Amino acid sequence: MTEQELQQLVEDISLKSFGMKFRHKARFNPRLRTTGGRYLLHSHDIELNPKHLELFGLDELIGIIKHELCHYHLHLQKKGYHHRDADFKLLLKEVDAPRYCAKIPHAQNSVKTRHLYVCTGCGTRFERKREVDTSRYVCGKCNGRLKKIKG
């Protein structure tokens, strides 16, 4: 899909789903790693991750476009455009847009757990990136002692 085809697709979705024109730029940004797209507040442009189109197809991309257009139209109407706002959640439901996009497999910033602790009282497992001082910290569920298993 070319940039012109993407621009036309975003304009069509905006008219059909929202009944309003999209008057700014839509483009692919291959630098996006962990997100499907983003709405830029200062320029009102929308950037989309081309990997989502490659890996998940056009339907996933259309969902991401609808999600970003929710941010776009609410921001221009001076309504709540954040994920936490009621206006945003309501508009997502109205246009059948997803709240989250599919995760890209093998994303570069996946969390690697190096240390594994187990509570001696209740058996709860705690995976941590950083080491924990077991003499200072206890289990949050039962106040039991922590025992280091891995790391």
From Swiss-Prot:
Q: Could you name the Gene Ontology cellular component terms for this entry?
A: cytoplasm
Q: What is this protein called?
A: Protein SprT-like
Query: Would you identify the family this protein belongs to, as annotated?
Result: Belongs to the SprT family.
Q: Which GO terms describe its biological process?
A: response to stress
Which keywords does this chain's UniProt record carry? Cytoplasm, Metal-binding, Zinc
Q: Which organism is it from?
A: Halalkalibacterium halodurans (strain ATCC BAA-125 / DSM 18197 / FERM 7344 / JCM 9153 / C-125)
What is the annotated localization of this protein? Cytoplasm
Q: Work out whether the entry's keyword set contains Protease.
A: no
Which free-text remark accompanies the cofactor?
Binds 1 zinc ion.
Q: Where is the active site?
A: 68
Q: Where does Zn(2+) bind?
A: 67, 71
Instruction: Name the needed cofactors.
Output: Zn(2+)
Instruction: Give GO terms: molecular function aspect only.
Output: zinc ion binding
Domain SprT-like spans what residues? 6-150
Q: Pfam families, alphabetically?
A: SprT-like, Zn_ribbon_SprT
Keyword Cytoplasm among UniProt keywords? yes
Please give the chief subcellular localization of this protein.
Answer: cytoplasm
